Amino acid sequence: MKKLILSIFLCCGLTTNIMAQNENEPFKGYYYNDEYNIYLKIDLHSDGLIVPEHEIFGKLPGYLGKKYNSFYWLITTKDIKNKKKAIVEFINDYGSEDLEASLSKKEDGTIILKQLNGSDLKVPNNGKWQKIPKEITLKKK
């Protein structure tokens, strides 16, 4: 009986801890957009993400990638304004284009990526460059 009660308290404590982490780190996770087959992997609260097959860049706060492709837009700088908004700067993995964007966290857990200044966000698609809209919604996975 004591083990059962202890187990229940531990489970409740872990659940509360996990929920608190999500509230304290709103700009962390994996977000995707099925229409353009792109995803955003971010941890703006630390510089701890390694871009697959691009380890030479070291640890970064995040990156935007395309499914089934090794092309990336790397997040080089971040500025968390509050729990619902952050400003980030991207550079493509060739270093030839860069842009500034805002990330807005919505109540349903989605993120709105809005391009502010700089180059257009483009990703490879069937041998051509596909422009991503200036504002796009990414769902949390």
Regions found by a protein language model. Give the residues of each.
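Extended Gly/Ser/Thr-rich low-complexity repeat segments
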Residues: 98-109
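Basic side chains
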Residues: 2-3, 17, 105, 131-134, ...
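Bacterial Sec-dependent N-terminal signal peptides
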Residues: 1-23
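Central antiparallel beta-sheet cores of small beta-barrel/beta-sandwich binding domains
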Residues: 22-100, 120-141
